[in-house]
């Protein structure tokens, strides 16, 4: 054996060892060997692959394989991909040991005759076969002959028996071959493809019979909501007052407009300044329409780039939206209260943008947080304030 061939075999063995990692031999399910031109199976490669007793998917592409005499015997294989090699029809007999194959990819090889396919034996579980770019596809009545040769065959060269493209279905079949314990080694190995076919048949049968029950793969537990006692009306009113008080206090801490009194706008118990302090509250604060953003607004004022471009970007965007909503609702609430209305309508929102200098600047494209800016084409129209 030449030195170059010895190097290639070593590369193949190293590739297999790298894919195995720390897994045991019976925990290896997928092996891929790509573009390593080892031409035929050396005894070391054969013995290494045969140690994987749970191997289900074997891919050997573009390796110039022309001799399958020493092909590894792995009965657990359900998908074999030998695309872009130099395999001839007389070599197919050495694949007989893989009798549980369900997907066989032999595209871009040198298979010439339909008779050569008979060398594969009776693969009764074969669902998908790919022979594209082989001379055999030019045979008269090629598709019918191949479908008759393999009774269980569903997809030939990505087409079904009716010539309808089933490429997506072929991909789904390939994906279903991945064992369910590939990442959780504590689960037992199951034949995923058989379970998929079983579930599909059950669903198909139930389309015509309303009395049958479709087998459920997973039963979702019913969530029973916990019983919550209904609070009294007095406690609800007290909680509401506490929430309003907390909001007003937070507004003072983040620099929003708030009453001048030290107790956050709550009327003082001192008789002399009671009405004076209460009258200094804005109409929105009196009605509970104050929405301080707390931490989110501080994010905006800090102008830190990491909040805008890193993993906290979603928090930053939520802060922008919540901040805008708070500003608009507060200003629109003031306008509604001034007009002696209990609800905010679109006119009040439009006036809120017109009368609030900060919102007006934002809508006009004011730069915020070192680079974030808004489009001037905002949903709400901007009306210039008329001079009196």
Swiss-Prot record:
Gene3D superfamilies: Histone, subunit A, Ribonuclease Inhibitor. It is found in: Nucleus; Chromosome. SMART domains: H2A (SM00414). It comes from Tetrahymena thermophila (strain SB210). CDD domains: HFD_H2A (cd00074). PROSITE patterns: LRR. Keywords: Chromosome, DNA-binding, Leucine-rich repeat, Nucleosome core, Nucleus, Repeat. Residues 256-279 are annotated as: Disordered. Residues 134-172 form the LRRCT domain. LRR repeats lie at residues 54-75, 76-96, 100-121. Belongs to the histone H2A family. Its main location: nucleus. GO terms for molecular function: DNA binding; protein heterodimerization activity; structural constituent of chromatin. The nucleosome is a histone octamer containing two molecules each of H2A, H2B, H3 and H4 assembled in one H3-H4 heterotetramer and two H2A-H2B heterodimers. The octamer wraps approximately 147 bp of DNA. Variant histone H2A which replaces conventional H2A in a subset of nucleosomes. Nucleosomes wrap and compact DNA into chromatin, limiting DNA accessibility to the cellular machineries which require DNA as a template. Histones thereby play a central role in transcription regulation, DNA repair, DNA replication and chromosomal stability. DNA accessibility is regulated via a complex set of post-translational modifications of histones, also called histone code, and nucleosome remodeling. One of its GO terms (cellular component) is nucleus. This is Histone H2A.Y.
